[in-house]
Design a protein with these regions (language model features):
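Acidic-enriched and Gly/Ser
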Residues: 1-143, 147-174
Length: 174
């Protein structure tokens, strides 16, 4: 916790200049809105630790603005707003996600999809033969409705693996 907000550390660097005091250069990412912040901490500065717990939840369905998840151990269902879910565009029914809780307040901080997911292409323009010399890409729509850039050889009905953090195509799945 820094300045009353929750962050996680993305990167840090211990700096010991020739003159002056040692300090830490830290890149923090807000859990609430995903914004990054770079800050310089003196070695004497202290931050409040926040205990978090990761639990496996299965996505069931969408109801209005809420995404309904079920705890796989006790079958408790919880609603989450789409803003709290990383990679929400690639979420499909039955996917198992990690939901991160603040253990002191039992509130949901965010939910993460697996890093890679397999989705079926529901629509894409047919690729033209002979256009394989370059790394040409085209738009495709996957079963969740998200749009992804794919190579020309991908056709409607193919299953593809997508990196949920970046939204990029990684490979075709047979």
């Amino acid at each position: 916790r820094f300045n009353g907000k929750l962050y996680f550390c993305v990167d840090f660097q211990h700096v010991k200049p020739g003159k002056g005091n040692t300090f830490m250069r830290v890149t923090l990412k807000s859990i609430v809105d995903g914004r990054t912040l770079e800050h310089r901490f003196d070695i004497s500065e202290k931050l409040e630790d926040v205990r978090v717990e990761r639990r496996q939840y299965q996505y069931l369905y969408k109801e209005a603005e809420d995404f309904i998840f079920m705890n796989q151990e006790d079958y408790e269902q919880i609603p989450l707003l789409g803003d709290l879910i990383t990679g929400v565009d690639f979420l499909k029914e039955g996917d198992v996600c990690e939901v991160v809780f603040d253990t002191s307040t039992e509130t949901v901080l965010y939910a993460e999809l697996p890093v890679k997911t397999v989705l079926e292409v529901t629509y894409t323009e047919p690729g033209e033969k002979g256009n394989t010399a370059t790394n040409a890409m085209k738009d495709a729509t996957v079963e969740t409705g998200a749009s992804v850039r794919v190579p020309l050889f991908i056709n409607t009905g193919d299953k593809i693996r997508i990196d949920t953090r970046t939204g990029e195509y990684t490979e075709r799945v047979k």
